[in-house]
């Protein structure tokens, strides 16, 4: 088929097609930097709240760290004070124990020193010839006087009503002359020391 026939039938001639050239708009070239500057600040507007929140959290954390450090310092101060008080208490306790021991030793030494003359008199009474009752009685009176000055007092028994806090009943005996519960005889004298019973009196009680 000839070209003329193809033209008549509306066909375009075969062959390589031409690319259409796109013409760029006329004007000055576009600067990328100016485009970025003139772009709407959408990205910065989105990150601003996040940065602000981050700053607030950091400030809160810093404040919490300061408060925690203050609490730790206060705790350490209390612990140091407690350790000092404990050490002072322990030292005071030891001093009091030493002082109490010293007082006990001094009191015992003083009592023994006062009893030595009584011991000497007993030795002399045993060496004496004849009846020694008077010498022993005098020695007993001397010993009683020394002990009474230290706080020793005898417990009243005969004729008293039985008191279990200071009396020990070793026997009960019917009696028409005494009321029930009355002490009618003392087997062994009891003593009080500074107002406290150190040995109960052993007695016979009427029933």
Swiss-Prot record:
GO molecular function: adenyl-nucleotide exchange factor activity; protein homodimerization activity; protein-folding chaperone binding; unfolded protein binding
Residue stretches of biased makeup (Low complexity): 32-47
Biased composition regions of type Basic and acidic residues, renumbered to the chain: 1-24, 51-60
Chief location of this protein within or outside the cell: cytoplasm
Location(s), subcellular: Cytoplasm
Keywords: Chaperone, Cytoplasm, Stress response
Highest taxon of the lineage: Bacteria
Keyword Metal-binding recorded: no
Family according to the record: Belongs to the GrpE family.
A biological-process GO annotation: protein folding
Assembly notes: Homodimer.
Family annotation (InterPro entries): GrpE, GrpE_coiled_coil, GrpE_head
Gene Ontology cellular component annotations, sorted alphabetically: cytoplasm
PANTHER family: GRPE PROTEIN, GRPE PROTEIN HOMOLOG, MITOCHONDRIAL
Any single Pfam family the record assigns to this protein: GrpE
Native source species: Rubrobacter xylanophilus (strain DSM 9941 / JCM 11954 / NBRC 16129 / PRD-1)
Cell cycle among keywords: no
Protein task: Participates actively in the response to hyperosmotic and heat shock by preventing the aggregation of stress-denatured proteins, in association with DnaK and GrpE. It is the nucleotide exchange factor for DnaK and may function as a thermosensor. Unfolded proteins bind initially to DnaJ; upon interaction with the DnaJ-bound protein, DnaK hydrolyzes its bound ATP, resulting in the formation of a stable complex. GrpE releases ADP from DnaK; ATP binding to DnaK triggers the release of the substrate protein, thus completing the reaction cycle.
Protein name: Protein GrpE
Chain segments carrying region Disordered: 1-60
